[in-house]
């Protein structure tokens, strides 16, 4: 449960920041007047809506292994976010496309991640209630700690260091997904 929560904290850090704190900071440091923070929020969200619909329509019909799916989507969501942040100064349209792809892969795994506890062996309603209570509490505590630390890094070490911290902090998600049990057997 704690591993699941810690991983979720890293996921939330990547997931919430481009919708709240990050766009304004990126706009201040992009050196590109074409970059608009509201379009970063919009493109991540639109990609996310499409990703959620994709996941709901496609993944529930397929019997696939969860860990490889979550790892691949985790790498892609972080990779596309990193590319979007790299291109924001030189090619704003490409950065918006990258943010949208990040949103797609971010949100398309969300239903799979949140349903994983239901697929664990010997799971019952009492265990699920306790697990999700701990999961949400620790997940958001980790996110809050990362967000606070990110703001300190931004204020004391600068923009580039804060972006590196943001991406590295998000990697905790992938690291902890590697420790999850696989709930679907290999065919």
Q: Residue ranges of each PLM-predicted region?
A:
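Multi-pass alpha-helical transporter architecture, strongest
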Residues: 159-187
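Hydrophobic alpha-helix/TM-entry signal in multi-pass membrane transporters
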Residues: 1-5, 70, 95, 132
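Helix-to-loop junctions at the C-terminal end of transmembrane segments
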Residues: 51-65, 154
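Extracytoplasmic gate region of multi-pass secondary transporters
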Residues: 1-56, 110, 147
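Intracellular helix-loop hinge segments at the cytoplasmic ends of transmembrane helices
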Residues: 24, 111-122
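Alpha-helical transmembrane segments of multi-pass secondary-active solute transporters
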Residues: 37, 68-69, 131, 161-166
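A late C-terminal transmembrane helix in Major Facilitator Superfamily
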Residues: 106-107, 118-158
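C-terminal transmembrane helical hairpin of 12-TM major facilitator-type secondary transporters
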Residues: 64-116
């Amino acid at each position: 449960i704690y591993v699941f929560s810690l991983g979720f904290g890293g996921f939330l850090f990547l997931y919430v920041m481009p919708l709240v704190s990050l766009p304004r900071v990126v706009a201040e440091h992009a050196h590109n007047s074409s970059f608009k923070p509201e379009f970063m929020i919009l493109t991540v969200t639109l990609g996310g809506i499409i990703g959620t619909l994709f996941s709901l329509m496609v993944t529930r019909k397929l019997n696939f292994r969860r860990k490889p799916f979550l790892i691949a989507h985790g790498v892609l969501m972080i990779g596309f976010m990193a590319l979007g942040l790299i291109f924001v100064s030189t090619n704003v349209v490409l950065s918006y496309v990258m943010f949208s792809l990040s949103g797609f892969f971010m949100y398309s795994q969300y239903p799979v991640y949140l349903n994983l506890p239901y697929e664990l062996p010997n799971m019952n309603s009492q265990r699920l209630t306790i697990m999700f209570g701990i999961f949400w509490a620790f997940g958001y505590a980790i996110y809050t700690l990362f967000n606070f630390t990110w703001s300190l890094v931004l204020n004391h070490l600068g923009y580039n260091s804060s972006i590196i911290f943001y991406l590295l902090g998000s990697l905790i998600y992938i690291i902890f997904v590697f420790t999850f049990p696989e709930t679907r057997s290999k065919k």
